[in-house]
Amino acid sequence: MEQKSIRKAIIPAAGWGTRFLPQTKAMPKEMLPIVDKPVIQYVVEEAVAAGIEDVILVTGWHKRAIEDHFDRSLELEKYLQARGKKKEFSEIKRIAELANFIYIRQKGDLYGNAIPIITAEPVVGDEFFAVLWGDEFIWADPPRLSQMLKVYKKYKGAVISAVRIEKK
């Protein structure tokens, strides 16, 4: 297969978030805020900055808030415009237009990191793609995905990221 640029990213976001209970009983862990936005928004923005065009979010039945976050809300937009809240209006519109969002509902009681990737196979086809965890935020300069795509282009093969953890 000829090497092409990576345009698609799969973001698994179907888990229960049990390590964060009780906070995640009513809110997906991917929607937990870091400062002023949910962690998954940082992940999507990093992907888009690295050249990703199609963001494939593999979610579960209890993750509707993720879809709502990245979707347009015409009622909210109208409300904000009527009250002159231009900054807020621009930001929610920008979020909805970050990428081409594709949502896939993970079915059944299957569990594991490979299941969302297999679930997204019909959308990805035979293209190379990135996998980003919807609840993982790593601050790096340059951003981690950009670093990985640079390695991918240089060596023309799969790339896995690792983080060194200091012993205490």
Residue ranges of model-derived segments:
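N-terminal glycine-rich phosphate-binding loop and ensuing alpha1 helix
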Residues: 2-82, 101, 106, 142-147
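Conserved beta-loop-beta/alpha segment of the NTase-like Rossmann-fold superfamily
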Residues: 76-78, 86-168
